[in-house]
Amino acid sequence: MLISNTYNQHFPQLTQEQLARNATKKVICGMSGGVDSSVSAFILQQQGYQVEGLFMKNWEEDDDTDYCTAAADLADAQAVCDKLGIKLHKINFAAEYWDNVFEHFLTEYKAGRTPNPDILCNKEIKFKAFLEYAAEDLGADYIATGHYVRRAGDNENAKLLRGLDPNKDQSYFLYTLSHKQVGQSLFPVGEIEKPIVRAIAEDLGLITAKKKDSTGICFIGERKFKDFLARYLPAQPGNIRTVDDEIIGRHDGLMYHTLGQRKGLGIGGLKNAGDEAWYVVDKDVENNELIVAQGHDHPRLFSKGLIASQLHWVDREPIRESLRCTVKTRYRQQDIPCVIEPIDDETIRVIFDEPQSAVTPGQSAVFYLGEVCLGGGIIAERI
């Protein structure tokens, strides 16, 4: 039996009764080949569960094999499972990913919006396709992932909470889950901080202990986003126009730019323009024009609120009365105090206490009451 002193210091010792109860439950742990899922599997073992791993392949390699880490990740996942003495299953969800995540991603970019495919991947793949496969084909009572979130309550009463580590909290990416999905899922590393996760992996001598966290969109990897997108969507160059209606340059394609962007606009050397940096403040999709203004505090960068649609509430009950809470309009943002005003069951108006910069249509607005993630929706427009 592998031993980790770090684990023993940070997790309570379970009673024999708790261990015996857990021993009747089978958990399929998603193994990505990273340190978080590796340590998650170990924690579940220590808590007495019957643990098996599952490696998901969600993207078929293309010509850029340098950028696709699937083979190396699978090898790492297998090495960890061998060390822990658990079985590793493998499944290919590439077709489901293409149909339910990637095509939506392209459609949104084509429409000039900035989607978040990781949120859609969690909704359609990790907590739908994976959950169904684990339960129906592998006989799982629960699935587990290496996400930094916590769960309170069971089954019908399950709530999604922020991860204990504020620097790693991933509840923003999981707001589309229902209370039933949360109730069927375990999040072992959500109860600890990232340095402790790495320390446990070091104690165990896991191959993933020092492995760098993956960054960026999973199907793009480390390659340049612009180069990748150009392979699937033909770029449509157009004018860069100022808020004062002056054309001052050309853009390569609206899809390559996002609200609040400062770098990479190629604007410079303009007479009477001053020294302040230029920022993207809007996209005119109809005329294929990028709208820019000078200064990080330009009024056009700010919104007093937003309209959100495609709503998902974790308890699946729509909000029908005004609610004071907090919101994040992008990952790792500080919570913004706000009031939700329902328009109908599918749409809400959100008014911030103070104007916010670079609120981006296509991104998600995720709402919180203290530690509890209530759910969220897609930003349809700025106010």
From Swiss-Prot:
The active site is at C121 (nucleophile), C218 (cysteine persulfide intermediate). This is tRNA-specific 2-thiouridylase MnmA. Its main location: cytoplasm. GO terms for molecular function: ATP binding; tRNA binding; tRNA-uridine 2-sulfurtransferase activity. GO terms for biological process: tRNA wobble position uridine thiolation. It catalyses: S-sulfanyl-L-cysteinyl-[protein] + uridine(34) in tRNA + AH2 + ATP = 2-thiouridine(34) in tRNA + L-cysteinyl-[protein] + A + AMP + diphosphate + H(+). Residues 168-170, 330-331 are annotated as: Interaction with tRNA. It comes from Haemophilus influenzae (strain ATCC 51907 / DSM 11121 / KW20 / Rd).
